[in-house]
Amino acid sequence: MKKLIMVLAATVICGASLFTSCKKDEDNDLKLEEKIIGKWMVTDMNGKPLPSNEKTVYTFVSATKATVSTSINTHPEVGTHWNDRLDADVTIDDNKITLTDHPDETTTVVEEYIVTDISGTEFTANHKVVVTKDGIVVDNDNHVLRLVKVTADYSTAILGKWECQELTGIETFNDANARLEFFADGTYNYWRKNDAGEWEAVTNREFQNYFVDGTLLATRWKNTGEDELREWWEIASIANGQMQWTALRQNADGTTAQQGMKWVKVN
């Protein structure tokens, strides 16, 4: 009888070990270390499309390193951040990806992605983010996110001077009377046509910055004596001297509206 009990116990232990091994193999079947490499943009949260100003681009250069690009000034609890390819540490454990970065000297951001599905073009995950400032948690959120792989990077193609040809949808800070020149150092110049039909540079700004990561374009500027302003766009295409932008905007009542701009390259 004692021998039978020992055999049964051994069977249970082996069975449990086999189940654990199978479960681990199932997680490893995701092959996150391989599939995650590349550039990804967050496009949906909890089943709804994200406005352009809420989007983030992650570039996984390896299974241990990534960069994060995002422009944040609409969430007072986490402060204002301008993250142009901010370095992040990455750990991957089965189907969990953890990113840790430091937007400034006092802030730490830890993101956990529990990946539920991944392909060569997109992945979905249960996402948790914890933001601490001076060791105090200032933000702790959980969402279901969808990320899409970004194959284009317009950070070089956007360089040069562009003239707006058309603006569709709602107007925010821009109208069709605009020329922009983007420089490799992350600054840009802005011109407007005066009443005489001549282009004049806008000179009342303390700074004008931008970054492009993949298809995400973020700008920020500050007029003398005024608050800093920001805007977000997604570059739909740049080809043959033509450039198209698109953006999903969210109104105060929660409704959304699409906006677009078309540009042509000029000398």
Where are these regions (language model features)?
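Bacterial Sec-dependent N-terminal signal peptides
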Residues: 3-6, 11-43, 140-154, 260-267
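Extended, hydrophobic interaction surfaces within ordered domains
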Residues: 16, 55, 92-94, 98-147
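Tryptophan-anchored aromatic micro-motifs
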Residues: 32-50, 151-173, 208-209
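Fold-core signature of tandem repeat domains
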Residues: 36, 40-42, 58-60, 97, ...
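Beta-turn initiation residues at beta-strand->coil junctions
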Residues: 42-47, 68-74, 99-104, 126-131, ...
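N-terminal glycine/threonine-rich, aromatic-flanked beta-hairpin/loop signature
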Residues: 51-97, 172-224
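Edge beta-strand at a domain terminus
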Residues: 129-161, 204-210, 247-267
